């Protein structure tokens, strides 16, 4: 089956993406550049796989994703013999949330003093920075680091803007620190998950049923948008566009 035919049959439904992803994985398409993608996450992320595979194929890549065991970050990064490196990734995605990395910043923010908030931000920055550095010690893979979406519910509610250190500001400061970490490491980039969620809307992003079933913080439409956006980042990082300038020196063009 031709790739064009496979992609043409994708109608936007999760089932059509799943079928197309399977056919792409089983087929041989010379026009697609192979890319192994390793994913480290603190939440259930593998449902994004079919969307990532199909949207990457639209952009000329045959992505083979590997999803590390749930919430295993350091275990995969620091062990050079881990399944992550055995998969020989060209791209490593670190998909984490503050809910898992720094629960106090989300769950009990109003009980924290300003120094506590600064400490939590520093701890997250140090941990993610350590992951990026650890990957670089064992691999030359491109690293994409998810930044953090605003919390769906502010601990102080309407009073958040009146806090000396607001929860909104704390999340943004954490994202700023992640950006600094990525700037300091060659081949590391921020995946702007926060913007993706904000543009789509918090209430539309999550499906409570999926969260309670399997700690999946994204509904099916959010999974599609994440897979599509990730494919764009991977394409830009691994195969940057080239520009050609044609100069007419003898009036023959």
Label the model's feature ranges.
Residues 39-40, 146, 248:
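Short hydrophobic segments within beta-strands
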Residues 1-3, 37, 251:
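Generic low-polarity alpha-helical segments
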Residues 1-31:
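Short N-terminal or domain-adjacent regulatory/targeting segments
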Residues 38-45, 49:
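Extended, charged helical/alpha-beta scaffold domains that provide interaction surfaces
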Residues 2, 25-35, 49-54, 58-221, ...:
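Alpha-helical cap/lid subdomain in secreted, periplasmic
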Residues 243-253:
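Asp-based phosphoryl-transfer active-site loop
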């Amino acid at each position: 089956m031709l790739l064009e035919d496979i992609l043409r049959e994708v109608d936007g439904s999760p089932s059509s993406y799943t079928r197309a992803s399977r056919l792409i994985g089983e087929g041989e398409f010379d026009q697609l550049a192979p890319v192994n993608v390793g994913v480290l996450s603190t939440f259930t992320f593998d449902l994004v796989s079919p969307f990532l595979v199909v949207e990457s194929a639209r952009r000329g890549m045959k992505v083979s994703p590997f999803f590390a065991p749930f919430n295993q970050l350091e275990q995969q990064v620091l062990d050079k013999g881990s399944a992550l490196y055995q998969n020989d990734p060209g791209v490593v995605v670190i998909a984490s949330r503050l809910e898992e990395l720094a629960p106090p910043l989300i769950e009990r923010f109003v009980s924290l003093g300003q120094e506590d908030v600064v400490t939590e931000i520093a701890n997250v920055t140090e941990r993610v920075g350590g992951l990026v550095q650890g990957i670089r010690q064992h691999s030359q893979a491109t690293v994409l680091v998810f930044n953090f979406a605003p919390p769906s519910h502010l601990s102080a509610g309407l009073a958040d803007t009146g806090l000396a250190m607001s929860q909104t500001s704390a999340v943004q400061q954490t994202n700023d620190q992640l950006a600094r970490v990525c700037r300091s490491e060659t081949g590391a980039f921020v995946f702007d998950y926060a913007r993706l969620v904000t543009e789509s809307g918090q209430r539309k992003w999550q499906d409570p049923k999926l969260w309670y079933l399997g700690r999946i913080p994204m509904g099916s439409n959010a999974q599609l948008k994440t897979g599509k956006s990730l494919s764009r980042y991977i394409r830009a990082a691994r195969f940057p566009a080239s520009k050609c300038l044609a100069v007419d020196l003898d009036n023959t063009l």
